[in-house]
Amino acid sequence: MKLPLLEEQNLKGKRVFVRVDFNVPVENGKATDRTRIEKTLPTLELLISKGAKIILGSHLGRPKGGPEPKYSMKPVFDVLSELVKTKVSFSESVIGSDVVKMTNALGEGEILLLENLRFHKEEEENVASFCKELAKLADVYVNDAFGTAHRAHASTEGVAHLLPAFAGLLMRKEIEVLSGLLAKPERPFVAIVGGSKVSSKFAILKNLLEKVDHLLIGGGMAYTFLKSRAVPVGKSLVEPEFESQAFQLIDRAGIQGVDLQIPVDHIIADAFDPNAKTKSVDKMGIIDGWMGMDIGPKTIDNYVKAIKDAKTILWNGPMGVFEMDKFSKGTIEIAKAISKSKAKTVVGGGDSIAAVNKAGVADKITHISTGGGASLEFLEGRTLPGVQCLLPKEEK
């Protein structure tokens, strides 16, 4: 996947519309986490150094197709003004002749932040006339919002067909890392997949089975696999409609020579509660009336052994109910093992990212993916509309 390089373009004096992902948590009119804003700074600094006139567009929250003050971009404007060493202006409108005038009046290296794009319902509907209005604001289009690349919205896909289009530095890094992971991983390639529901991860498991040497399964989804093999799972979370597919996936792994592992022991509880009674049980299964809440010590040892020998590691999803301290050990131990590995390590998914932060090892991970749903769809092997529209015509 070859993307044209933003660094090689002459952008002096040109108006550049950058689709960013500034969908940050806001409380009492203040942005409480500025990580997503900070991650776009390399792209913004590049554009400032090139003398571009920068127009930023993002969504925030889920407004219902019209202006809602609680979803205003103003708290983002306050943070952005602190973070960049240039003049930042704010437009209360997204489109229209007044906004076009504001874009033309920008000095080189200056920034104009637009109000929430989703205050127009046409944004999510990718309406052609709205795309044309957005295109009037700029001479060049840049998408630096990988987290929204799986959505074919006006600002993520539609407008890219109307202007010269490029990936921002953050977007390009995500695409390069995830593409490389799937195309030419150094072996052994170990994927660790967790989370509560097998239904939300089954497409990834199927795609990864064709590419990995070891597939380690944890979290609530593991109990559907265990049930499919007639292992007692008590009242653990099971999706009966996925039992036969889970059974077949284990069989297919055996035929293809992939080491697919499921938990051999468990930390169980008598209720889904941080104060529940707990026990450790082995592969004979989970007692009636109890539920699996985390992988057990033998499973941790097995998974850590596979991680130690790996050259490439992908981790998506926790090993247990790690937000409850009693059931966080499996997830934290996996995070620590990955951090000690000399392999190329990629971590994605909000819970896994929270786990590496909780374990204090985020700085030892090669790449932490900001993609969320976009990362999942990319790993499933699906085409992302927001990426497809950035490719040179011969690659589309």
Swiss-Prot record:
Principal subcellular localization: cytoplasm
MF annotations from Gene Ontology: ADP binding; ATP binding; phosphoglycerate kinase activity
A GO cellular-component term linked to this record: cytosol
Keyword field contains Kinase: yes
UniProt: ATP binding residues: K201, G292, E323, G349, G350, D351, S352
Keyword Protease: no
Keywords of this entry: ATP-binding, Cytoplasm, Glycolysis, Kinase, Nucleotide-binding, Transferase
Locations listed in the record: Cytoplasm
Stored Pfam families: PGK (PF00162)
Coiled coil: none
Catalysed reaction, written as an equation: (2R)-3-phosphoglycerate + ATP = (2R)-3-phospho-glyceroyl phosphate + ADP
InterPro entries found in the cross-reference section: Phosphoglycerate_kinase, Phosphoglycerate_kinase_CS, Phosphoglycerate_kinase_N, Phosphoglycerate_kinase_sf
Associated pathway: Carbohydrate degradation; glycolysis; pyruvate from D-glyceraldehyde 3-phosphate: step 2/5
Sites where the protein binds substrate: D21, F22, N23, R36, H59, L60, G61, R62, R118, R151
EC number(s) reported in the record: 2.7.2.3
Similarity annotation: Belongs to the phosphoglycerate kinase family.
Subunit structure comment from the entry: Monomer.
Protein name: Phosphoglycerate kinase
